[in-house]
Structure formats: structure tokens, C-alpha cells
């Protein structure tokens, strides 16, 4: 087989080293030689356009360097995605939108423009995720009205508790009962440090 004479496996491995994503590396390693003239011409034209596109200083965005297949399969089956996973999906959508827009402006690379037109337009989903998930993967207050109200109630209750603890601390300080003038937490509870002889 001519592929072994050309050290095709080593060539594929070298190409994979230049890819930006896990999936891109896998696709590079799975390349097989072809005798189909139309496919050869098409791939050469795509490669030529990609080179031309990069030479004019433009670039592409790839989003997070992770394999989204398992994550998307889980979502398709109705599974839950963690906050950081949702934000990674948002970054992938943002990159796809950028590439679609950027390549759509380039008349010199019609094949790449055609490929970019196959990227789905999901800016509404991107916007929803952006409004609900922080870059750290935390669910934002405005993810839903119910969550917003619940978190507001929790903050108000926490503020009331802090005020009560501070009043008690001042009162016990005047009575010289506290060991240190601070409020700490033990086992998730707010506590005042009382002098051992006063317990």
C-alpha cells in the first residue's frame, strides 16, 4: 500500500499536532488516502482557501478545547449540564457565530464561506445561557424570576442575621463576656466566642 511508503501515519500525526481541538486531532488521524479526483480537487481548494484566509491576517475561533460530543449527547437524552458545561457550550456557540459572520464577509474564499453557512445560527440560545450562567459556571440570579426572588430572600435573611449577631456582640462586649470581638462560623453556624469562665 502506497500510504505506508509515504509514511502516511507520521504525516497524519504531524497534521494532528497542528489542530486546535480534540476532535480536529481525531479527524486528522482518521484521514485516509482517496483516488476520487473530485474529492482531491475539493480538499485542495479548501486547503488553498484556508491558507489564503490565514495569510490576510484573519483567524478563526474554536471555543473551548474540549470534546463536546458526550456533553451534547447527555443534553439530547434530557440529562443535566453543570454550569461550567453550559458556559463552555455558550463559548462554542459564540465561536461558531463569529466564524459564520467572519467567513460570510470573505468573497475570496467561497468554499469556506459555504462551509460556514452550515454553522447553525443559535444566537438566541447563546444569549439565554449568557444571561443565566457566569463565566465561572455559577447560575446567575436572573436565570429565572423564582431564583431571583429566592436569592433576594436569602440575602435579606442573612443581613437580618448579621445585624442581630452584631447587636449581640456589642451587648456582650459591654458585659465583658466575649473572648474576642468577632463573629465566626462553626459547622455552618454563626457563633460568638464567649470566655470559658462565663460559659
Predicted features and spans:
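Conserved amphipathic alpha-helical "coupling/scaffold" segments
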Residues: 1-154
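Extended, Lys/Arg-enriched charged tracts that mediate electrostatic binding to polyanionic substrates
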Residues: 148-199
